[in-house]
Amino acid sequence: MKAYNVDNFAALIGIDWADKKYDICEHPTSTNKYHYTVVKHRPEALHEWAMDIKQRYPDQKIAIVCELKKGPLIYALAKYDHLTLFTVNPCAVAKYRQAFTPSGAKDDPSDAFLQVEILKLHMDKLSVIEPESAAMRTLSQLVEYRRSLVQDSVDLSNKITATLKNYYPQALEWFKEKDTYIFCDFIQKWPSLIAVKKARKQTLLDFFESHNSHYCTVNNARLDSIKNAMPLTLDEGVIVPNQMLVEVLITQFKVLLKGIEKLDKAIKSAYKAQQDKKIFDSLPGAGPQLAPRLLVAFGSNRARYNDAAELKSTQV
């Protein structure tokens, strides 16, 4: 990893992210001055600011520091050759603020200023954000979005489970795995015990077969359970609202499952194109889900990790 020092840059700039704006502190390294400005959360405004910096410091490098490693701000600034992006741990800024500005008064230095001070004093210890290739960034985003959707599906599955327990708990016993189309389609077709008890035996068997549930013992156990099941409640004041909620949640759940499948296909394709695919495929326990995540964690710029502890802290 290339080592940087303050002398490499014409200016040090700290950027503090807020909901609708970026608070910016600019420190020309040839002076003791600090300039403050605000840029709106708009791509055009950020581009105008970046180009203004380039004009004011022609043919010179500018060091940018912020508390982010990725996100809209990083994506927007990474394309400018005159900017070198550093990241500082938010905890470090918080500790610095607490140590040197304990009053909490309105005239205390901003986080953007504190970031500049940390950059000026500890540049050699900060990580540089070096953009990955477009292919690696694509894979990284896909893996991240898949992880997010999987968590959404877990949360939604828990809501469905909790709602079914209110009026139709037997359905949870008939299907061990909830993140499946057979479970979703069953609930959509027979959203209550009363409804499924009206179904003919052959109709149920055909349903199971059409969803690749071919084990006779499992299907017969389901049929026996359906036949002998007793309603938890006959109170329409409980059944009707909970059934309506389950139907809404199941519809959302199926959309999520299809979305995850779509991302899986995209991840498989993006991962297949990676040069180091064979290396990560060969790792013990690295299957179709884990191998792409490991590759994203390592990235193509592996020199950015100083030790195994830094790599271990990476979320994939």
Predicted features, each with a name:
Residues 1-316:
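A detector of single, family-specific signature residues
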